[in-house]
Each structure stands twice: as structure tokens, then as C-alpha cells.
Curated annotation (Swiss-Prot):
Residues 188-191 are annotated as: Aspartate. The record marks 81 as: Important for tRNA non-discrimination. It catalyses: tRNA(Asx) + L-aspartate + ATP = L-aspartyl-tRNA(Asx) + AMP + diphosphate. Homodimer. The lineage of its organism: Archaea, Methanobacteriati, Methanobacteriota, Stenosarchaea group, Methanomicrobia. The keyword Nucleotide-binding applies. The gene is aspS. PROSITE patterns: AA_TRNA_LIGASE_II. Mg(2+) 3 binds at residue 352. This is Aspartate--tRNA(Asp/Asn) ligase. L-aspartate binds at residues 166, 210, 355, 359. The keyword Aminoacyl-tRNA synthetase applies. It is found in: Cytoplasm.
Length: 429
């Protein structure tokens, strides 16, 4: 049976492995193959006078990135990666790679991001890139486990919808038989409907689609959103869950992803301390203005403003009490100052990671707010009906998985944090 490379030790004595030829060195009487699988790299040493003709023929056939299978004796040696090598008594080429390769998986020859994404199947073989997705997987596992442990039910909501979640024109239309339909921007409306259904606490990890024309290092047109909604809760309750979700993801990565972090060269990985600091929107625009990026009440925070405030805060933090005019129609305003609402953003010093709020659960107020945004309540009848028959107060948020991983690992482009990115210029591969 095949053994993962990370589990191959001299104590095993004899092992069978399979993987890709990462590098090859021919020193005359000796040939060295570095064989890579998902778990690591192992040196396969071929003493030409001591192996069979079949092994020698297979070694000659094997090109870089060919898939091979080999079996042999495992020996300890200080000169090999990981302090061990395998001397094969069987080696065969399972799938020979053509030459030249369109991309150097060993990364000795650098490549532009577009070239890498065009050949993503090869790019993902790189140990450094693979490490990003091992950590992403760990984050989603930790987040799911935290939410399950805290009484949340995982759900899957429709991705084909008849109306915009948040209004606006940032929608991808679909040819849906004889009806008008769109790819969903967010599970927001359905999460809220589940509060009326008595689900109490729900979460979803799924795709969202936004037809934004941004072409930046922090925007995607298809992304993965981690969403929650919880009944009988306000914005403070939602922030409490959020900061603990994020801290638990960091802690899980710190505890279980040491090898992946080392592959990425991260030696000072820090788990954020909870609770995260909180500042109001008013305080944020004052900090931005003092830092040279003037803002007035009602302005959204620009990239420059986020940078100025983030440098001052120096850690993850919340911005609370946003102008009602800047938030979607389903956000609950403060009763005594309706121009301000119970919304928050969770910020990394580099950028926004999450938006959330206490939601409006009062049918008449919700209809008013839909109209105030220039939208037609009739288009939201399916959503509004549950509010007529007993809707508890509720709150929630949506966290971008790619932005979480991007900031956690200090990646320079969000496309690095998704397997096959979709932006305004890329729909393949």
C-alpha cells in the first residue's frame, strides 16, 4: 500500500510511494529523484550499478513532473531532505510529463501571476501554493467546528434568485427558462427567512457572485462567503461570535499547520487577542481626516482611509454605528437616532473583512427602508411575508474566506487564496 511521504521513515524499513518528479540530478554513477506528494518531498537514490535494468529504464523515461511509483528500502542519511532516502527495487512511470513544462513547479524560474493562473493545475503543485490551501482548509474546518459547537445549523441557500439581495446593478443575469433570474450576491435574505422559520442559529459557507467591475488585488467576482444569522440577538452578540470565530481559525492554524506555515516562510504567526477593539464610524472618519484622508459623515471608507485607520489600530478591530444611508435596507437603525444604524465592519489593518448588523425585524419599517433605497417592495414579497407572521430580532454577518486567508498569510493578491479565480477578465480555467 502507498505510504504518504511525510510518514516514510527509516524505521519502516521498506516503503512504497507515489508522486511527481520534483527535480532530477544525474551524477554519473548516481541519479537522485526528488519525489513530491501532497505531504512532502522524498529523495529517491538510484545507484546505477545496484538497481535493475527496468528501474534504470524508468528513470531515463521520467521527466520533471512525471507521475511515478516506486518501492524500496528506506535509509537514514543526513544529506537528503528530511534525513532519509529511498533506494528503489521497483520504479515505474505512471504518467510521463511532456517537455518543456509551461511553468516551473520548483519556482527556480519565476512566472507572472497571469501565466501561473493560465496553468493553475501546475501552479497548485508548488509546495508553497499547496500550503495556502492546506491553511484555507484548516480555517474553514475550524470555523465550522466552532459554529457547530455553539449551536449553529449549517444550511445551503439558493444561488439562483429572482431579486437582488441588496439592490443595485451588481448582478449576473441568467437565462432561466422564461423567467428573469440572477446569480445570488449573498444568502442574506434566506438567512433571515430561516430566523422566521425558527432555526435560531444558522451558518453557510458558499459561493457569492458580484458583477463589480473592480480589477484590484482585493476583489473577485466569485468568492466564498462565511455567513451566520442568529435570533434574539443584536449587533454586539454577532460581533462576539465573529471575533471568536476568527480567533479560533487562527488558533487552529497555529496548532495544526506548522509545516504549511514554515513552507510559506511564516515564523511569527500570531493569534489575535479577543475581544477586538471597537471604534465608531465617527471616530474612524476623524482618524482618517487627521491622517490626511478627509471624510465627512456619510462617506464610505476609502482604501486610503482603511490604511490610515488600520495603521493606528494595529490589530483586528470593529467599526460600529454606521450611517444608515451607507447600509442595506435590512439594517436596523437606532430608535433614538435613525440616521445611524446597528451595523459594523470587522477590519484587518489592511482591509475590511466582514460586514454585519442587527437586522430590521419590523415589517412596516422594512418596507419603508426598501422604498427609501429606491426599490420596489413588490419585488421582495417572498422575503417580506415572513416578517408579517412573527419575526424575532436577529443579527448576523458575512466573512470573505479569501480575504481572511489573504490577510492571515500576508498574500499580496486575493487571487492567490482561491483555486481558480474569477474576475472581470478571467473565466477559465
Amino acid at each position: 500500500m502507498r505510504i504518504p511521504i511525510k510518514d516514510v521513515t527509516p524505521e519502516i524499513g521498506h516503503a512504497r510511494i507515489a508522486g511527481w518528479v520534483h527535480e532530477e540530478r544525474d551524477l554519473g554513477g548516481l541519479t537522485f529523484l526528488l519525489v513530491r506528494d501532497r505531504t512532502g518531498i522524498l529523495q529517491v537514490t538510484i545507484p546505477k550499478k545496484k538497481v535493475t535494468p527496468e528501474v534504470l529504464a524508468a528513470v531515463k523515461e521520467a521527466t520533471r513532473e512525471s507521475v511515478i511509483e516506486c518501492e524500496g528500502v528506506v535509509k537514514a542519511t543526513e544529506k537528503a531532505p528530511g534525513g532519509r532516502e529511498l533506494v528503489p527495487d521497483m520504479l515505474r512511470v505512471v504518467s510521463r510529463a511532456e517537455t518543456p513544462l509551461p511553468l516551473d513547479v520548483s519556482e527556480k524560474v519565476p512566472a507572472e501571476l497571469d501565466t501561473r493562473l493560465d496553468n493553475r493545475y501546475l501552479d497548485l503543485r508548488k509546495p508553497r501554493i499547496n500550503a495556502i490551501f492546506q491553511i484555507r482548509n484548516a480555517c474553514l474546518r475550524a470555523i465550522s467546528e466552532y459554529l457547530w459547537d455553539n449551536g449553529f445549523t449549517q444550511v445551503q441557500t439558493p444561488k439562483i434568485v429572482a431579486a437582488a439581495t441588496e439592490g443595485g446593478t451588481e448582478l449576473f443575469p441568467l437565462a432561466y427558462f422564461d423567467k428573469e433570474a440572477f446569480l445570488n450576491q449573498s444568502p442574506q435574505l434566506y438567512k433571515q427567512m430561516l430566523m422566521s422559520a425558527g432555526f435560531d442559529r444558522v451558518f453557510e459557507i458558499g459561493a457569492i457572485f458580484r458583477a463589480e467591475e473592480h480589477n484590484t488585488v482585493r476583489h473577485l467576482n466569485e468568492a466564498t462567503s462565511i455567513d451566520i444569522e442568529m435570533s434574539f440577538a443584536n449587533e454586539e452578540d454577532a460581533m462576539h461570535v465573529l471575533e471568536n470565530v476568527v480567533a479560533s481559525a487562527y488558533q487552529y492554524v497555529a496548532d495544526h499547520c506548522g509545516d504549511a506555515l514554515a513552507t510559506l516562510g511564516i515564523t511569527d504567526f500570531k493569534v489575535p487577542t479577543v475581544p477586538f477593539p471597537r471604534i465608531t464610524y465617527k471616530e474612524a472618519i476623524e482618524i482618517s481626516t487627521a491622517g490626511g484622508e478627509p471624510l465627512v459623515f456619510g462617506d464610505d471608507l476609502s482604501t486610503a482611509a482603511e490604511r490610515i485607520v488600520g495603521e493606528k489600530m494595529g490589530t483586528m478591530y470593529f467599526i460600529t454605528e454606521w450611517p444608515t444611508s451607507t447600509r442595506p435596507f435590512y439594517t436596523m437603525p437606532f430608535e433614538d437616532r435613525p440616521e445611524v444604524c446597528r451595523a459594523f465592519d470587522m477590519m484587518h489593518p489592511r482591509m475590511e473583512l466582514t460586514s454585519g448588523a442587527q437586522r430590521c425585524h419590523i415589517h412596516s419599517l422594512l418596507v419603508e427602508q426598501i422604498k427609501a433605497k429606491g426599490l420596489n417592495p413588490d419585488a421582495f414579497e417572498f422575503y417580506l411575508n415572513p416578517f408579517r407572521y412573527g419575526m424575532p430580532p436577529h443579527a448576523g454577518w458575512g466573512l470573505g474566506a479569501e480575504r481572511l486567508v489573504m490577510t492571515m498569510l500576508d498574500l499580496q493578491n486575493i487571487r492567490e487564496a482561491v483555486l481558480f479565480p474569477r474576475d472581470r477578465h478571467r473565466v477559465s480555467p
